[in-house]
């Protein structure tokens, strides 16, 4: 689960087929550790420097050739003899770098964890690229022509047995998906939010072979899973991807992290009309007198169920959302309207800021009506306040572009009275950032690209970093330390092992700490610590802007804080599917090269080198090579 914390494992009945759940669906607690099934895909990343200096990688588009054609020819040259398809999510970012994603195929089927991303500069030359294409032997197609593989229903049962999913399938039926090869939908299954799906694909195994698998998709609230079930046995699970990562508004204004930092105020028309052209209370076709609009729909969800449309939302015919709240109030349900408004405000403010930083419709952002700006619509964020499916946590589900994101904010029971996570902006921002990193890494159509332990850890780290950067105050210096989740958890130390700090005494974390660590949250703390160093190096050079939005000059933030955030966002779009620390670092360096011609190269290198990810650092799954060295010129 990509949530704020790692949830404990609660056992479910072992015989899921003998005891199906009742009609409808209930909240399912995870009965197995999904980390055991994480993908182990290895990608390569040729950064901008390597690409420019290697004649074998130099490739320039022909006159009048599109960037998609250029990228396609490049992949053909790099991977001769392999078959692949262009993923329909290519775009040109606001830094003028074009991003094109490819999926390898075999015998007419996708190899679901074999991807190639090509970044093309505005000069028509290849800027950088990432590659996780399968290089082994392609199986003979005879098993497909003879249909020598299991039925998708067998794969669904195998998923249920292996992952202990309590689904009711006694009334299930199956039908093929129109226009798709070996793709099916299960109707009449209880225990899921939406109908399960199965699609026949290949899966590249760590031993260098390809397995024919059924990719079984099951959304069971807390876990929205893609399970790769061996199509021969119908039982062996080769890997699992989880999409879930645990007017007038009276609110705590943007920049205040929680109730300890200030007071609520009335804010009038806070939206950015470029990012939210319909305002926050309209989707361009209809105006809503409630907490619903183009970017999100916020409501209470005490049952923890999925039928959000009919749930309670505060209503105001004159769009004046002013409701009482005090941190000393109890129970939390007594201030649910204030909670919903706060969550709606924070999520929309972040949407508008991210738009300025480059997370727009064409890059896969979350909007119901994309208004002809590219990408796929119908995917605002479902914002559940005081969600009854859990406590002391939060999570965000990120399906591919065109399907709504889903944020669940919980009540925290670590204090008396209990505290509502929606009033800690850092938690909301952390969760929303899962949606950003999943949509940008590998392209908007692929939400599987932060599925390895290290990539998933960086997913947690990006969330912590963005939340921390946003809460900076005018008087802060690089000596300022920040914790994560301290107010909600009622613990001044927060919910991470160390506070975010540039002091090696206060926070000694370095690249070597990732060795042997299988917790995405502790890995993420290492990554966010490095980004915190990066931010302060850039602030020392460019100054600090604590306004709600950056001042841009030629598409570049003029201050160090927002420049760091911009480079992080741009780096996500450049890096390969399932990156490691070294590749993500190189993507940030490339982002600066594209945005500023490398003006901040040394500041970036110094930040990473301080924490062991310097020049010469190398990724190895079991023993990472650390380095505090700087490249020449720094």
Swiss-Prot record:
Residues 1-18 form the signal peptide. Its cofactor is Zn(2+). Glycans are attached at residues 318, 545. The keyword Transcription does not apply. PANTHER family: EXTRACELLULAR METALLOPROTEINASE MEP. GO terms for molecular function: metalloendopeptidase activity; zinc ion binding. Secreted metalloproteinase that allows assimilation of proteinaceous substrates. Residues 19-246 form a propeptide. Zn(2+) binds at residues 430, 434. This is Extracellular metalloproteinase mep. Pfam families: FTP, Peptidase_M36. Its EC number is 3.4.24.-. Belongs to the peptidase M36 family. GO terms for cellular component: extracellular region. The keyword Glycoprotein applies. Binds 1 zinc ion per subunit. Keywords: Glycoprotein, Hydrolase, Metal-binding, Metalloprotease, Protease, Secreted, Signal, Zinc, Zymogen.
């Amino acid at each position: 689960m990509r949530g704020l914390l790692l949830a404990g494992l609660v056992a479910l009945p072992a015989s899921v087929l003998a005891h199906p759940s009742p009609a409808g669906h209930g909240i399912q607690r995870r009965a197995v550790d999904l980390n055991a099934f994480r993908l182990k895909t290895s990608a390569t990343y040729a950064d901008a420097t390597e690409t420019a200096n290697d004649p074998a990688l130099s490739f320039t588009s022909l006159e009048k050739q599109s960037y998609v054609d250029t990228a396609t020819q490049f992949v053909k040259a790099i991977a001769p003899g392999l078959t692949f398809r262009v993923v329909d999510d290519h775009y040109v970012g606001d830094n003028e770098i074009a991003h094109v994603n490819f999926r390898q195929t075999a015998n007419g089927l996708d190899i679901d964890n074999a991807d190639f991303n090509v970044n093309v500069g505005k000069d028509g030359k290849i800027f950088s690229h990432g590659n996780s294409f399968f290089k082994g032997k392609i199986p003979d197609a005879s098993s497909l022509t003879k249909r020598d593989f299991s039925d998708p229903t067998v794969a669904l049962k195998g998923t249920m047995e292996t992952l202990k999913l309590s689904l009711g399938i006694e009334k299930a039926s199956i039908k093929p998906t129109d226009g798709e090869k070996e793709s099916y939908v299960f109707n009449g299954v209880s225990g899921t939010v939406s109908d399960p799906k199965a699609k026949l694909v290949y899966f590249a195994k760590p031993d260098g072979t390809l397995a024919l698998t059924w990719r079984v998709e099951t959304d069971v609230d807390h876990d929205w899973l893609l399970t790769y079930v061996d199509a021969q046995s119908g039982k062996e699970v080769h890997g699992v991807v989880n999409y879930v990562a645990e007017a007038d508004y009276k609110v705590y204004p943007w920049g205040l992290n929680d109730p300890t930092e200030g007071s609520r105020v009335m804010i009038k028309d806070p939206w950015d009309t470029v990012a939210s052209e319909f305002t926050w209370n309209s989707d361009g076709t209809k105006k809503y007198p409630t907490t619903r609009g183009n970017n999100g729909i916020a409501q209470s969800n005490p049952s923890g169920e999925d039928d959000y449309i009919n749930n309670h939302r505060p209503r105001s015919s004159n769009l004046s959302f002013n409701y009482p709240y005090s941190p000393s109030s109890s129970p939390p349900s007594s201030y649910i309207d204030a909670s919903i408004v706060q969550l709606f405000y924070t999520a929309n403010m972040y949407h508008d800021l991210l738009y300025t930083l480059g997370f727009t419709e064409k890059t896969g952002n979350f909007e119901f009506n994309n208004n002809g700006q590219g990408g796929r619509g119908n995917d605002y964020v479902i914002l559940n306040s005081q969600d009854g499916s859990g406590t002391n946590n939060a999570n965000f589900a990120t399906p591919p572009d065109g399907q709504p994101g889903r944020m669940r904010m919980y009540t925290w029971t670590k204090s008396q009275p209990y505290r509502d996570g929606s009033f800690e902006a850092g938690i909301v921002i952390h969760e929303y950032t899962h949606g950003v990193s999943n949509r940008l890494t590998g392209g908007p159509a692929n939400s599987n690209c932060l599925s390895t332990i290290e990539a998933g850890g960086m997913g947690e780290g990006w969330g912590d970093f963005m939340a921390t950067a946003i809460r900076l105050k005018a008087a802060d210096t690089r000596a300022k330390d920040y914790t994560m989740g301290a107010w909600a958890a009622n613990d001044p130390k927060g919910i991470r092992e160390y506070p975010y700090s540039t002091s090696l005494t206060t926070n000694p974390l370095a690249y070597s700490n990732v060795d042997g660590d299988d917790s995405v949250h502790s890995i993420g703390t290492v990554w966010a610590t490095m980004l915190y160093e990066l931010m302060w190096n850039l602030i020392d050079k460019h100054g600090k802007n604590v306004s709600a939005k950056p001042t841009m000059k030629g598409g570049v933030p003029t201050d160090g804080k927002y420049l760091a955030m911009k480079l992080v966002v741009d780096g996500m779009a450049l890096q390969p599917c399932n990156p490691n620390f070294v590749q993500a670092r190189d993507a940030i360096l490339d982002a600066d090269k594209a945005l500023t011609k490398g003006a901040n190269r040394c500041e970036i290198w110094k930040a990473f080198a301080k924490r062991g990810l310097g020049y010469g650092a190398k990724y190895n799954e079991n023993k990472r090579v650390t380095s505090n060295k700087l490249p020449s010129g720094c």
